[in-house]
């Protein structure tokens, strides 16, 4: 089992301009994510959710404290962590199969082997016939599936997901939430996902971490079992309609409202 850990990790943006003040974005974050866990981070704007993901990815380094993978300090991006953004960031001049195979090409895998592996991954994400299609021929949901397949190509220990479904319509988003859970289970990786949606957090998470804003601090770390219900075969619509789901949704809404200024929350 691998573990991604934040130990007293703080992030400070330096002052800008003569009269600017340094900004404390994240304050003494203590958090761990293990393989086999799906941890979802929620919080208001200004709580540092994306900054937290950037630290995990190695795009930024903490100003204080440390972020480590299996005890080794993270000093930059690595193939043991794969990032999926809201924007699919695919290469439009390549077809879907070659997009998925691109990380394998960088690793030096031969063409025949990487194309075979890309085909396996496209089948995993439900797109076995899409390999020769150009990216601009695919719907938004299909592009995100290709992006997730590409992220899995290097067999990362952790998937880092920055609102990967946020730009999709409600129906496609709901369908891909169940798909994402299934892919995570089959990949046997750990997952750290950022979202504004309490509903999405409850459906996907094995643990929900709530960040308070300005600066971002861990306000709560709560286990959740609804994802296990869905993976066991319960329809997401029935899970959403359950009294337990509604109680936890209301509780999280109240918590987030209590720790930040009034503003609209995503359902």
From Swiss-Prot:
The keyword Electron transport does not apply. Keywords: ATP-binding, Cell inner membrane, Cell membrane, Membrane, Nucleotide-binding, Plasmid, Translocase, Transport. Its EC number is 7.6.2.7. The keyword DNA repair does not apply. Its main location: membrane. It catalyses: taurine(out) + ATP + H2O = taurine(in) + ADP + phosphate + H(+). InterPro entries: AAA+_ATPase, ABC_transporter-like_ATP-bd, ABC_transporter-like_CS, ABC_transporter_ATP-bind, P-loop_NTPase. Residues 6-238 form the ABC transporter domain. It comes from the Bacteria. GO terms for cellular component: plasma membrane. It is found in: Cell inner membrane. It holds the Pfam family ABC_tran. ATP binds at residues 43-50. GO terms for molecular function: ABC-type taurine transporter transporter activity; ATP binding; ATP hydrolysis activity. It is a peripheral membrane protein. Belongs to the ABC transporter superfamily. Taurine importer (TC 3.A.1.17.1) family. Part of the ABC transporter complex TauABC involved in taurine import. Responsible for energy coupling to the transport system. The complex is composed of two ATP-binding proteins (TauB), two transmembrane proteins (TauC) and a solute-binding protein (TauA). This is Taurine import ATP-binding protein TauB.
């Amino acid at each position: 089992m691998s573990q991604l850990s934040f130990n007293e990790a703080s992030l400070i943006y330096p002052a800008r301009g003569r009269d600017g003040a340094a900004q404390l974005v994240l304050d003494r974050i203590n958090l761990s994510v293990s393989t086999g866990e799906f941890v979802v981070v929620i919080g208001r704007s200004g709580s540092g959710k994306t900054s937290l993901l950037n630290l995990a990815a190695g795009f930024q380094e903490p100003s204080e404290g440390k972020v480590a993978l299996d005890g080794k300090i993270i000093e930059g991006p690595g193939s043991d962590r794969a990032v999926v953004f809201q924007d699919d960031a695919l290469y439009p001049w390549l077809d879907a199969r070659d997009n998925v195979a691109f990380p394998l090409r960088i690793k030096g895998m031969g063409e025949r082997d990487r194309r075979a592996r890309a085909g396996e991954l496209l089948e995993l994400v439900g797109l076995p016939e899409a390999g020769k299609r150009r990216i601009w021929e695919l719907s938004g949901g299909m592009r995100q599936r290709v992006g997730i397949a590409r992220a899995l190509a290097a067999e990362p220990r952790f998937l880092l997901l920055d609102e990967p479904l946020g730009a999709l319509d409600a129906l496609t988003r709901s369908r891909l939430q169940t798909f994402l859970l299934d892919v995570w289970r089959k990949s046997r990786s750990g997952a750290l996902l950022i979202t504004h949606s309490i509903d999405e957090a409850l459906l996907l998470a094995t643990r929900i971490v709530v960040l308070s804003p300005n600066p971002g601090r861990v306000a709560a770390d709560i286990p959740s079992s609804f994802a296990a219900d869905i993976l066991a075969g319960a329809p997401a619509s029935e899970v959403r309609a359950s009294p337990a789901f509604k109680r936890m949704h209301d509780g999280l809404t109240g918590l987030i409202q209590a720790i930040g200024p009034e503003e609209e929350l995503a359902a």
